[in-house]
Amino acid sequence: MPIKFHEGSKTFHIYNKHLSYITCIMENGQMENLYYGKAIRDKEDFSYLHEEIMRSLMAVCVPEPGLLSMQYTKQEYPVYGTGDYRNPALTVRQENGSEIVDFKYVSHEIYGGKKKLAGLPATYTENEEEATSLDITLHDPVMDTDLVLTYSVYEDYPVVTRSARLVQKGDQKIRLENVMSVAVEFPDMDYEMIHLSGAWARERYVKTRKLEMGIQAVQSLAGTGSSSEQNPFIALKRPHTTEDTGEVFGFSFVYSGNFLAQVEVSTYEMTRVMMGINPQGFSWELSRDEEFQTPEVVMVYSDKGLNGMSQAYHRLYRDRLMRGKWRNHARPILLNNWEATYFDFDEEKILNIAKKAKEVGVELFVLDDGWFGTRNDDYQGLGDWFVNKNKLPNGISGLSRKIEEMGLKFGLWVELEMVNKNSDCYRAHPDWLIGAPDRFESHSRHQHVLDFSRPEVVDFIYDSISKVIEESSISYIKWDMNRYMSEPFSRGASAADQGKTMHKYILGVYELYTRLTERFPDILFESCASGGARFDPGMLYFAPQTWTSDDTDAAEREKIQYGTSFVYPIVSMGSHVSAVPNHQLHRTTPLSTRANVAYFGTFGYELDLNLLSAKEIEEVKAQVEFMKEHRDLIQVEGDFYRILSPFEGNDTAWMVVSRDKKQAVAGYYERLNKVNASWMRLRFKGLDEDQLYKVKWEDKCLKAYGNELMYAGIPVDRDYCNKTNGDFHSVLYTIEAED
């Protein structure tokens, strides 16, 4: 078993071949974190890792002559009020106004497999041998409250997952005001913090900062989503860690709402990482026999650099977070009509676009916004999930049938969490809006947020959209969400329960996803939130792909997809070839480069193919054929490697290598041409050093061994780049092992 409890030293050792995580019961009954890092040999006693010394101003939490102080101890789950003056993982308001808590060890359970988290997405196992789990139960006798810390370690991944659960056993009501999912402490501060930051159309840019004493944090208060501004992920890496070497610790939050990821460095250079639901705007009352479960944090340890961390997340999320029919299944090549028509379409126009899509080999046609209610613009119609017969006289059922008769699958866009005031839904249920009755209701994109914290709202939307799906032949649903929450107040909740609203909203979204995916298990769901404002592990549990960004410009997508790959597998990244000039930046990039970027994702088109020249249509046909030939490798069977960062220079490169190292596809992208440019060699990664490969690109072919391709590299033809497409040139390499 990869979790052992050593009774004599009261130590838990959680480990596999990749990592060790060691925690122990201290003399005051609280838990201490002794070590987290590269796997070390198991033994009875690691108590030498506990450090204790008399310091001025410290509060000692054991009888004299003891020296145990929480201020200088690497705690497993720090709380408020017993002498630790750093931020706590847990804040509980009691009936007498006190926030002092003291949870002491009571018992533990070690078991095979991994339990589900009630109402929440989480990683999972399919048999007990895949992982081992540990529940440590702590108890506060004054409140008569249990705190259960849950750990799971996978057998084959460098992963430990963490969550916490509070159970109120006593008669008094307690109010949770801060409940982190995880706290981990490191003995030094020699780290750099990586986070993925941005905004609409420039999501998940890679940011790195050196840790300093004090607090550094990223967060979301968006309410409806994890946000474009900050992704629910951070990593700590050693200063000399690269993409391929060195230590890195990743923390990824399996949640889609408000979050806080915080790193606090003490004046003694100890580093505390905490991650969980953002305490701002959150409070949760527990009465006797009630409990609260936090979402899960997935921690990855890598001693093989950032690529090693990312590949661990990719494999785990692809294999044990995504579920259902589309887990480990290549995605259909689609065409979405949004940038081709926006709201201006009718059945004839849609059928003409779909017909051309079929001619080039596309497999799925997706009808985007504008098909329902009075939805002729974004001022009206949201909430009314019935067909606009003026645009589609034969309804979705008739249109989907005609699309299928062409030999295409049919997909549909929805935005189920939102409502326009100009809608039948709002006129019938004005109290279903999130918003305080005595405050102005802020609007965004002319729409408002439905109160998904209320079960009757979720029921109504479920019934409405299920009817549309049942009556039609739908293979794919794009579930959009186009605004953050403001005035977070539920008209269906009491004053005491308003602090539950934003978390209950996300639980309502999960509930609707659960009901729809269970009722329609064959449908491929893609999540979307004004592009990538809710690209998080919580969504991937229900929808195995996410629209990566509303920015479809190929050059910008290099940055967005590069940053996204730090955590998320490329099969989860919605990526399309769009028209030029690009609709977001008005930039023109070569058709080949647009495809060469989009290949490293789900791949599809977002334009009217009828507007392309005959030569361009032939190029599109070749692109579709290439993707069909290589999508199993790219999306399902391969490991993704980052090679050159768009955040560090003019060039970007990445590649996918099959697990058996027999096949690979690599992309190289040059943003701006340079006059009389210097020589450059592209060094591949992940190949078998002793294997002879055939490399093809453009009109060239080369045979070389893996060690040549990885260490000597392959020259990039700068002159060819200058003579062909000008700026934004790219090269696609296919690599095949020779017998």
Kindly give the residue locations of the regions a language model identified.
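Aromatic-lined carbohydrate-binding/catalytic grooves of carbohydrate-active enzymes
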Residues: 326-460, 476, 486
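Short Pro-Gly-centered flexible turn/kink motifs
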Residues: 98-105, 284-303, 728-735
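Conserved, mostly hydrophobic/aromatic
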Residues: 18, 164, 289, 335, ...
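Active-site neighborhood of glycoside hydrolase catalytic domains
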Residues: 393-395, 427-429, 433-588, 602, ...
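Glycine-rich, aromatic-flanked loop segments that form ligand/cofactor-binding clefts
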Residues: 71-72, 76, 81-117, 245-258, ...
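C-terminal beta-sandwich/jelly-roll accessory domains of carbohydrate-active enzymes
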Residues: 672-739
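Polysaccharide-binding surfaces and accessory modules of carbohydrate-active proteins
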Residues: 5, 9-13, 17, 31-264, ...
